[in-house]
Amino acid sequence: MAWTQHRRGTDILTEGFVFALHGRMFGDVWSWAGSTRKTGKNIGIDPAQIHVQLGGLLRNARYWVERDSFASDEIAVRLHHGLVAIHPFPNGNGRHARLIADLLITELGGAPFSWGGQTLCDIGALRAGYVAALRAGDRHDFAPLLAFARS
């Protein structure tokens, strides 16, 4: 997304940026892009809690960055996991969370993640590995998601 390269001075750890990014990514596809979901899903939190939980996640991420609480890769991966867990949008949550993680790791001086790259021919196996890594994150084990992000 070319416009993300011209965002100097933009704080990505804000709700405004989170929603604007989703709108920019998917605005040509879905009229509701950049708006929170209004219904429950089999993944994610209650829609009424999205802003509360998202605000907490972004404050935590800012704290992790300011205090060097974790290595840069882990901060970005934890942010990614939290965004997917909250699931603020009806669709596009994973792609959106991966881009935000890439933007954050780049801002922290690292290289963007490969997120499994193109090495697996079977997209089903790639997705299964990604979902398994996210589930490990649900148990506070971020090693599989870190490994997947850099694979």
Describe each model-derived feature in a short phrase.
Residues M1-S151:
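FIC/Doc superfamily catalytic core
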